[in-house]
């Protein structure tokens, strides 16, 4: 009987049956042929074969201001898609023009942000402000509930204890500690204020990390006082002010996660938004966390929940940098913006350069561990692309015309006006981002 069932499941497909294995084989064969043809075409270009291809642990320039190399390979046209979608191996090469060097310098400057969280005095100060007993109690209770649910379903618990600690921190940070600022109230009469341009920072404000100051005027004509709103980037100062917008929220919350022992990434989005990623030892992957929205593990929030077009999402940590765009943009054709800052080969080169700079003095064993972690994350990011492609192929079949859940479905909040939500967040700031663009951070 078992043998009969086996033969029944492997019988040749009829004209009315759909064989996914056959479609998969045909698709793979087609991509092999296309990849081989493209590689042959590339091999005929002598300039391409001369381009350097540094590995993460080879000798490379460690400072953005170093001179151009003697050989300048021809640059392909920038792509609006992630390199994984082109199904071609990337041969990294260094920046060759002014725009590429500008982007490289920007990423190097941004990569310094998470290194500031390693100050022992800063972490001690942060711990003194966190209600540890409350957070650990909430985490313990939530962890027990998760474990009980897992036992009843005979499954592995979804989250571990450390994950629950960060989730408790997220709730406390959003609801009790940090405060959102649109227009700061008048400090003299507490009346709402009206934006009145910008002002240069005072020496004291500049010393505390304020690169720019927003100026507001009291809406009460009888008062007319001016209110200054320095945009502090120094985390020490944020522990005192406890207010700000997206940039301040992500910066301070990321540092708090580090203070609680978490491995932290500060994620920069080229559309001028920032958030946090925390590594889950339980799930062995990086988790998206947005302190402003109090969201946990909802990476598709921005593209699919808010309907935003996204080009670059670069995650920075004390271990280097990673292009995590594929985690947040599952369908580049629908939600991706043009990736035109630099060619993909140059972006890979810059990321490898930052990784080498952060890791070259680490023990060899730790370097190997991080390298394996990079490989595991790359497989995860490729899986997102493969699942999105599989869902699109499945929807092309006549029997699957009706809407169905995608295999990589992750729930996102149902926002009444997702477009307005993002636009409002961008209007909350009004200051230029690190690359000089006007944005919400």
UniProtKB/Swiss-Prot annotation:
InterPro entries, sorted:
Papain-like_cys_pep_sf, PNGase, Transglutaminase-like
Q: Where is this region: Disordered?
A: 1-23, 38-91, 397-441
Q: Where is the composition biased (Low complexity)?
A: 46-84
User: Does the keyword section mention Metal-binding?
Assistant: yes
| GO CC term, one of those recorded | nucleus
What Gene Ontology biological process does one annotation of this record name? Answer: glycoprotein catabolic process
Query: What GO annotations for molecular function exist for this entry?
Result: metal ion binding; peptide-N4-(N-acetyl-beta-glucosaminyl)asparagine amidase activity
Q: What is this protein called?
A: Protein PNG1
Q: From which source organism is this entry? A: Emericella nidulans (strain FGSC A4 / ATCC 38163 / CBS 112.46 / NRRL 194 / M139) (Aspergillus nidulans)
């Amino acid at each position: 009987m078992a043998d009969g069932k086996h033969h029944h499941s492997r019988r040749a497909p009829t004209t009315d049956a759909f064989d996914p294995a056959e479609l998969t084989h045909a698709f793979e064969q087609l991509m092999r042929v296309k990849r081989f043809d493209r590689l042959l075409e590339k091999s005929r270009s002598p300039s391409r074969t001369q381009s350097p291809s540094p590995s993460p642990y080879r000798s490379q320039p460690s400072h953005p201001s170093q001179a151009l190399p003697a050989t300048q390979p021809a640059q392909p046209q920038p792509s609006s898609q992630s390199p994984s979608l082109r199904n071609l191996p990337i041969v990294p090469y260094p920046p060759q023009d002014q725009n590429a060097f500008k982007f490289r310098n920007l990423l190097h400057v941004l990569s310094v942000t998470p290194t500031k969280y390693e100050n022992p005095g800063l972490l001690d100060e942060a711990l003194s402000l966190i209600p540890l007993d409350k957070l650990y109690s909430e985490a313990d209770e939530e962890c027990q509930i998760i474990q009980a649910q897992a036992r009843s379903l005979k499954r592995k618990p979804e989250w571990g204890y450390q994950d629950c600690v960060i989730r408790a921190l997220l709730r406390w940070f959003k609801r009790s500690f940090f405060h959102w600022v649109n227009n700061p109230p008048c400090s003299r009469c507490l009346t709402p204020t009206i934006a009145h341009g910008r002002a240069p920072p005072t020496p004291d404000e500049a010393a505390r990390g304020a690169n720019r100051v927003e100026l507001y005027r009291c809406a009460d004509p009888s008062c007319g006082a001016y209110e200054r709103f320095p945009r502090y980037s120094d985390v020490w100062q944020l522990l005192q002010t406890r207010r700000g917008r997206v940039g301040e929220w992500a910066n301070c919350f990321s540092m708090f996660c580090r203070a609680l022992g978490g491995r932290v990434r500060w994620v920069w989005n080229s559309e001028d938004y920032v958030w946090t990623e925390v590594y889950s030892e339980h799930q062995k992957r990086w988790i998206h966390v947005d302190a402003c929205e109090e969201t946990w593990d909802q990476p598709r929030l921005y593209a699919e929940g808010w309907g935003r077009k996204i080009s670059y999402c670069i995650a920075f940590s004390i271990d280097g940098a990673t292009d995590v765009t594929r985690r947040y943009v599952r369908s580049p054709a629908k939600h991706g913006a043009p990736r035109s800052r630099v060619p993909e080969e140059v972006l890979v080169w810059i990321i490898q350069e930052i990784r080498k700079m952060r890791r070259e003095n680490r023990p060899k064993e730790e370097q190997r561990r991080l390298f394996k972690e990079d490989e595991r994350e790359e497989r995860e990011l490729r899986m997102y692309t493969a699942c999105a492609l599989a869902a699109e192929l499945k929807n092309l079949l006549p029997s699957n015309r009706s809407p169905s859940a995608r295999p990589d479905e992750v729930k996102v909040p149902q926002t009444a006006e997702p477009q307005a939500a993002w636009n409002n967040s961008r209007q909350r700031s009004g200051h230029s981002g690190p690359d000089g663009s006007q944005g919400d951070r």
